């Protein structure tokens, strides 16, 4: 999950960034609170940023990540869906939704979202690895092992372990 959060923060596009300095200040405060583990405080500040700028896709996505960490899966899914509706070219949003779907055992949804993420970012090793795990759950070993290999090619250490475990 930490890698997913870092991925979302590092690979975020500028399209979803707010042009409003007050919204951005709340967003910045929320990031700091999330980094120190104050997830409820971060959610409050992301919400304030969103109220000022309802099209602030990055705030929705980060709020989704914080909600997911506190177990508000429904709220996280709503926020990530909003992110995608605002900015459908955000691969990291599809990867985040795929992670939520995976943890909810919606493997078909995970595969679809990972595939979309890979279309938008062909080197998204998190999406390849997560899609590979989903293929394992639906007993499609061939595609799982191919995805683990791709994830390894792009730098995933988790995929190395998964390939050793599932692709014998």
Feature-to-residue mapping (PLM):
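Alpha-helical tetratricopeptide repeat
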Residues: 2-168
């Amino acid at each position: 999950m930490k890698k997913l959060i870092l991925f979302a923060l590092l690979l975020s596009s500028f399209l979803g960034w707010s042009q409003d300095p007050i919204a951005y200040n709340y967003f910045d405060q929320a990031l700091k609170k999330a980094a120190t583990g104050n997830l409820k405080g971060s959610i409050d500040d992301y919400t304030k940023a969103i109220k000022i700028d309802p099209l602030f896709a990055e705030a929705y996505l980060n709020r989704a990540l914080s909600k997911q960490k506190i177990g508000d899966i429904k709220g996280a899914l709503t926020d990530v869906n909003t992110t995608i509706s605002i900015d459908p070219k955000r691969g990291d949003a599809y990867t985040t939704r795929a992670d939520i779907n995976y943890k909810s055992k919606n493997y078909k949804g995970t595969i679809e979202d990972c595939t979309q993420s890979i279309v938008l970012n062909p080197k998204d090793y998190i999406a390849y690895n997560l899609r590979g795990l989903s293929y394992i759950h639906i007993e499609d070993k061939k595609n799982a092992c191919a995805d683990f290999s791709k994830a390894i090619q792009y730098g995933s250490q988790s995929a190395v372990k998964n390939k050793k475990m599932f692709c014998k």
